[in-house]
């Protein structure tokens, strides 16, 4: 059976410290949490801790870049479409020019809103509702909610030039079982 995986490639990274590496891993975990949550937006969005969707994360650093692969604990097509919508949003925001005079969380949410998909699918509507919820939180002066932090994470990934890809990979336990055991 195949798992849904989100591959995030960051290029042109200078040597990064542990804190920056932890931030990148947190960003990728947020993308995974959004992908797991978008098919059921009536549920509570949980990014970390108890109640968060379990994931498996692999990190590879090569040359000037870092690649992270996060495998979701979901195999359904809805989660795959949600992950693709998030990847598309990050790519679109990266292409969206940043206004010189616009600063702050509201301006960031405006960038996300302009780049958000305008389709009629359930996932695209859920993305727009997520962004509208983040905007509502900001207007109510609640800037530390999960929605606002998740939206800012998507912007950070886009600003860092992250390439987000969604793919299917072989289930890790199944792959391990297929290999013969080797004595050590």
PLM regions with names:
Residues 39-41, 54, 97, 117, ...:
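Proline-rich intrinsically disordered, low-complexity coils
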Residues 104-141, 158:
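Polyanion-binding surfaces on beta-sheet-dominated domains and ring/shell assemblies
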Residues 14-24, 75-82, 95-98, 116, ...:
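Intrinsic-disorder-associated interaction segments
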């Amino acid at each position: 059976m195949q798992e849904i995986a989100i591959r995030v490639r960051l290029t042109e990274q200078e040597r990064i410290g542990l804190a920056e590496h932890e931030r990148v891993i947190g960003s990728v975990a947020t993308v995974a949490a959004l992908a797991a949550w978008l098919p059921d937006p009536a549920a509570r969005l949980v990014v970390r801790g108890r109640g968060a969707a379990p994931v498996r994360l692999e990190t590879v650093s090569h040359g000037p870049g870092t690649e992270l692969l996060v495998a979701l604990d979901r195999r359904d097509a809805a989660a795959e479409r949600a992950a693709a919508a998030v990847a598309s949003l990050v790519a679109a925001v990266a292409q969206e020019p940043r206004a010189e005079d616009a600063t702050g969380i509201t301006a960031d949410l405006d960038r996300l809103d302009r780049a958000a998909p305008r389709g009629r699918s359930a996932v695209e509507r859920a993305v727009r509702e997520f962004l509208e919820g983040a905007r509502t939180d900001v207007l109510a002066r609640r800037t530390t909610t999960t929605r606002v932090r998740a939206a800012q994470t998507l912007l950070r990934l886009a600003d860092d030039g992250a390439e987000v890809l969604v793919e299917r990979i072989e289930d890790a336990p199944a792959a391990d079982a297929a290999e013969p055991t080797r004595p050590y």
